[in-house]
Amino acid sequence: MYLLILFIPLLSAFVTGFFGNFLTKNGTTKIASSFIFITCIIAYIVFYEVCFCQAPCELTLGYWINAASFKLLWGLKFDSVTAVMLVVVLTISTVVHIYSISYMGHDPHINRFMAYLSLFTFFMLVLVTANNYVQMFVGWEGVGLCSYLLINFWYTRIQANKAAIKAMLVNRVGDISIIFALVSIFATFNAVDYKSVFSLAYVYANSTISIFNYDLNILNFICICLFIGAVAKSAQVGLHIWLPDAMEGPTPVSALIHAATMVTAGIVVICKSSELFEYAPMALLIVTIVGAITAFYAATIGLVQNDLKKVIAYSTCSQLGYMIFACGISGYNVSMYHLTNHAFFKALLFLSAGSVIHSMQDEQDMRRMGGLLKVLPFTYSMFLIGSLALLGFPFLSGYYSKDFILELAFANYTIEAHFAYILGTLAAFCTAFYSVRLLLLTFFGKTNAHQAVFMQAHDAPLLIAGPLTILAILSIFIGYFFKDMAIGVGSDFWNGALTVLFTNNATIEAEFLPFTIKIFPVVISLLGCVMAIIIYDYCTKYLMQITNNSFFRELYIFLNKKWYFDKLYAETIYQNVLYLSYNPLYTVFDKGIFNILGPRVLTNTLEKLSMYVSEMQTGFFYHYALIFLISLTILIILSSINFFILLIILFILFFFIFKKENK
């Protein structure tokens, strides 16, 4: 049964991709959705057996690579982390498939779309079920490929082409780093399977590697390489630039990428490698700092975005920062808990945004909306639930996980943890502000939409409303019901799938923090909500005066330009690489030196050589015999064959030649 979890999505991708034109749109969508739904049911059975019955399972299918000392088995590992990810991935994938039946129903290429979605799901399942790093890398590359295909689904749009190429190239940086990590793991442990590597981690805790005459702890090096891969895949600061542009794909793709698949891959790899990270303190320090900066950075950019989907995209980037710095302070269980909660309310937000965009004739600018509460009441209620869960409103799913991450950071008595707490709290304020701003600009006030568009706006049909309702229920209740299992003191839910050294465990301290510390993030979030309501509801006439102020105008430009990351990369990397590629390499080497020394010299040499050879065609047999003799002599000198044997052969040949000439 466990094998069906991988086999059915692959079969769905194969059938819809190769036979979709014979099955019609209706048949293709039903087959793909049914296959993924069946897989989702199996995933819940696996979740029950592995997590509740404490029965982790590992399957070995056979040898994949068997070369000298490198032996690699193709196997599947079903532990608690895998079981949770199976439920998250397949639940989101199921609702996205059903949602796409209505949302993409008008598209003539829906067969290809369904095939890509199923293939995306398959590769994510390969990643989370792998029992070794090489097999994990197959899934890692697969989700990268499928993200390229889905972002570039409407391939006639130039912006979609650019966004897909950008996502692919940025993720190549992380992929190269993952390859370095894999090579280092095999060179150190002489194995790549999780069981062997993790069992030997403590042995190499103090081993070093020399890089440019600098001794670096080998586990620090491996974990930093793994983390750089996670930075690219999970859109952390520095390699985050592909994520907002990924909004060029269809909205269901955005929900699948940002909620359950590609961006969570980096978090899963870090959590599965917790045994290595616990013995790599420098790597944990870097993880904490980068995650905290990302959480704050992305939240500040979300304050000034006007594109509906990009606001939600930057909120994803910010929430991923929370998960990353939770891993950095050894809160792997809290990170997985927040990943689970975030998946459902973020999918709800994206699919609700798709419902709004669909009803507004593909309009995404919030400044051209407004007043949609009366015409889209159901979609508004779904958006409200998702936004409140995102900002951490009490007793919704985001409240339990995000606040506990901040409590855990406060309870870790280290400088980097308190740094993460400060930036995380500021990010919580910004998150609340832009979440309420999104609701006010989209659903309240007077409409700024074109009259014809506004009059034709309609609420979500059944195939869109159904998935939204399921996600809304999960966004409300999953955090409460999952809390004690995932992060409760003394819980054995993870059953050894996550490793935390006792010196790094601050869960008990976080449970007994003062009430003022626990309530502080909630107060900050409510303050952000109130400020957004005051500015965008009661004081809208003062917005222009605020932007006329030089300080606020420069601040707005700075945030709207995304902290000038795109400008920095364009001027320092893109332009220099383009200049270097064209001027020295293309014009001097390719068109100059290589062209002269290569084709031109070769053609001239061959032409002169052929003329010289043609002059040797005298028609006299003894001339040809002389050439033959000289050539054969040269070959004899250059060869290692016995010289006397060749002399005998040469004598016999000349005997027959001269005998024939005398005749």
Predicted feature descriptions by range:
Residues A13-G17, H97, A299-I301, L438, ...:
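Alpha-helical transmembrane segments
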Residues N21-G27, M104-H109, L303-K310, N642-F644, ...:
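Membrane-helix interface "capping/anchor" motifs
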Residues M1-F7, L23-S34, F70-V88, V126-G139, ...:
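Membrane-entry segments of alpha-helical transmembrane domains in multi-pass membrane proteins
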Residues E49-Y63, A67-S80, V489-V523, Y538-K663:
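Aromatic-capped, Gly/Pro-kinked transmembrane alpha-helices
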Residues S34-C51, G174-F186, F383-L391, P467-I487, ...:
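Hydrophobic alpha-helical membrane-insertion segments
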Residues I92-M136, L145-M455, L474, Y480:
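Hydrophobic transmembrane alpha-helices and their helix-loop junctions in integral membrane proteins
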Residues M1-L3, F7, F18-A115, V192-N213, ...:
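Transmembrane helix-loop-helix hairpins at membrane boundaries of multipass inner-membrane proteins
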Residues K346-F350, H418-D459, G466-I470, K483-I487, ...:
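Predominantly late transmembrane helices and immediately cytosolic-facing juxtamembrane segments
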